[in-house]
């Protein structure tokens, strides 16, 4: 039906006859002539209708926005005064001599020239996707997956599918359950990741596996989370952590170069402990110049219990955060930041404005200055590299509260004060704790229970699980965790030790992971892998801060599809076939 896409018409086609198919993006009737901007997935081109072609001109008078049409015409060069440098096709236009209205459009529920609510956009997603911005995002996503497939193929990876209907296993979030009609009373689970299957593929000898795969987690949603999401899933045999990181870093560096022409350079490596100490986060945004500085050793003997208590507590922390030029903040603004950190459990927010740094105690203004002497103040100013006109905020509480509260404050201040550098800052975060306390006297795996410990024997792990570090690694770009992985456990005794450490009994091990423990008995190779979030990578590469902008048909933050009205009630016959009774009834 067409000879060329709208967005591909250039000055090289001048005087050629072309046929275009697409939609009316905009229509302008200038009396003697009718102009339309005609759009398809590749872009927009200007078409004009002249009364000299009376049949086409008469039909063009009926055109309205979003009519689906076919146009035949001659490519003309625009006069110099009419060249539109903002359009890829801005040097040309189409003089139409043929027009076919393929389908008319009713008045639109969306206005493409205004900002529509997200609810409107999701309800009429098929119209929202016609917007050039949305088409560009999904085309970028397609380019990303195409690049990934080429890279993986060139490096010897096999694209192997794993099951969608599988067994529920404890991986952190809730599973989406699928009832079985054949095995009444039993349920499949949709996979949170292909974790165990990709490990089994390594045990089967496939050596290098990848898959671009849907995963499902029934968890509370945020702006960058969806109940169904897409992973670039990777697993390798006989490679150590450093080799996996090198392979995957080169993939991401190549991706950034290919998609947006940016050289990310070599990724720095930072330990989890250093990231938490300096930034209060295991996914630090290095574009933000502010860092947390520990000062507990200076405050153990002060008379101010808010500082002295955590300073003397092995599980406590006192940290300072210097804000460049922050002394300009008003008391009202400081109170707002104090309210903000309370969300993260902080009981208050002490502060110190630096008027004259070289004057020590005499050169600062602070409600807590009366509890500090000149030597302490000078050391705080020195450690934080404070300058005249700065403000220093203090966090004093448990290590977790200080990291959470001051880490979040660091991000908010950088946004509010425009301190974030406009660049790309990737890194690897490594050496995560193997376990963390669960608040009930036990421990839980920080990543997942199939991650191998770093330089720990089963006996050492059993004796002191909280002392173990995981052989795990996360890739972080501009404060987003874009991928994470680890070396996996490949010995049965270590796997059972980890299961016991997190409170999984022998009986439960056999019930839920018997197939894995059996497989580990038959010459399992050392293996390691990683998974990237495709949605999040696309979000970064397209410059949006909303993951729903890079998914064709996303869910709302309430995990609903406004367009299809999913989820919906099942009818009684369906429920009966599945031997299911529900306590919630559909509205009559």
Swiss-Prot record:
Residues that bind L-aspartate: 171, 217, 447, 488
Record-linked CDD domains: AspRS_core (cd00777), EcAspRS_like_N (cd04317)
Chief place of localization: cytoplasm
Binding residue positions for ATP: 217-219, 226, 481, 533-536
Family: Belongs to the class-II aminoacyl-tRNA synthetase family. Type 1 subfamily.
Subunit structure: Homodimer.
Protein name: Aspartate--tRNA ligase
Annotated organism of origin: Tolumonas auensis (strain DSM 9187 / NBRC 110442 / TA 4)
Name of encoding gene: aspS
């Amino acid at each position: 039906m067409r000879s060329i896409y709208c967005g591909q018409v250039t000055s090289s086609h001048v005087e050629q006859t072309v046929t275009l198919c697409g939609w009316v993006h905009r229509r302008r009737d200038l009396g003697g002539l009718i102009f339309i901007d005609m759009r398809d997935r590749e872009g927009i081109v200007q078409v004009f209708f002249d009364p000299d072609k009376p049949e086409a001109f008469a039909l063009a008078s009926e055109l309205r926005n979003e009519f689906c049409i076919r146009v035949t015409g001659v490519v003309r060069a625009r006069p110099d005064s009419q060249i539109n440098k903002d359009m890829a096709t801005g040097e040309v236009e189409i003089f139409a001599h043929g027009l076919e209205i393929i389908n008319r459009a009713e008045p639109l529920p969306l206005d493409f020239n205004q900002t529509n609510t997200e609810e409107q956009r999701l309800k009429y997603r098929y119209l929202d996707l016609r917007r050039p911005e949305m088409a560009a995002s999904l085309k970028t996503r397609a380019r990303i997956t195409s690049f990934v497939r080429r890279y993986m193929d060139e490096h010897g990876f096999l694209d192997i599918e794993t099951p969608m209907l599988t067994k529920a296993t404890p991986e952190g979030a809730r599973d989406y359950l699928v009832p079985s009609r054949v095995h009444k009373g039993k349920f499949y689970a949709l996979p949170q990741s292909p974790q165990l299957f990709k490990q089994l593929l390594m045990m089967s000898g496939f050596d290098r596996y990848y898959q671009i795969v849907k995963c499902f987690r029934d968890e509370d949603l945020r702006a960058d989370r969806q109940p169904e999401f897409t992973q670039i899933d990777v697993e390798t045999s006989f490679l150590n952590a450093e080799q996996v990181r090198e392979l995957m870093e080169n993939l991401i560096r190549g991706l950034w170069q290919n998609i947006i022409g940016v050289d990310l350079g070599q990724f720095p490596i930072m330990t989890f402990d250093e990231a938490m100490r300096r930034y209060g986060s295991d996914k630090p945004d290095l574009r933000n110049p502010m860092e947390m500085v520990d000062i507990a050793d200076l405050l153990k003997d002060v008379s101010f219990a808010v500082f002295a208590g955590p300073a003397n507590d092995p599980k406590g922390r006192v940290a300072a955060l210097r804000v460049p030029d922050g002394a300009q903040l008003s008391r009202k603004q400081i109170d707002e930041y104090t309210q903000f950190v309370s969300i993260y459990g902080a009981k208050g927010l002490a502060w110190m404005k630096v008027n004259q740094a070289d004057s020590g105690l005499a050169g600062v203004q602070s409600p807590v200055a009366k509890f500090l002497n000149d030597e302490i103040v000078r050391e705080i100013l020195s450690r934080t590299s404070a300058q005249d006109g700065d403000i220093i905020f203090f966090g004093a509480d448990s290590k977790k509260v200080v990291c959470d509260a001051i880490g979040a404050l660091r991000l908010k201040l950088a946004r509010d004060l425009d301190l974030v550098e406009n660049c790309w800052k990737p890194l690897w975060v490594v050496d995560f704790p193997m376990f963390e306390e669960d608040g009930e006297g036990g421990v839980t795996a920080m990543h997942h229970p199939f991650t191998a410990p770093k330089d720990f024997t089963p006996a050492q792990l059993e004796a002191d699980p909280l002392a173990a570090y995981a052989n795990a690694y996360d890739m972080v770009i501009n404060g987003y965790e874009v991928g994470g992985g680890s070396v996996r456990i490949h010995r049965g005794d270590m796997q059972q030790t980890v299961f016991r450490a997190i409170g999984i009994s022998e009986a439960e091990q056999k019930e839920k992971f018997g197939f894995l423990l059996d497989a580990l008995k038959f010459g399992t190779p050392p293996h390691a892998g990683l998974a990237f979030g495709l949605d999040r990578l696309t979000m970064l590469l397209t410059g949006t801060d909303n993951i729903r902008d890079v998914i064709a048909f996303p869910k709302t933050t309430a995990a609903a599809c406004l367009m299809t009205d999913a989820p919906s009630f099942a009818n009684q016959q369906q429920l009966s076939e599945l031997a299911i009774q529900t306590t919630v009834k559909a509205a009559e």
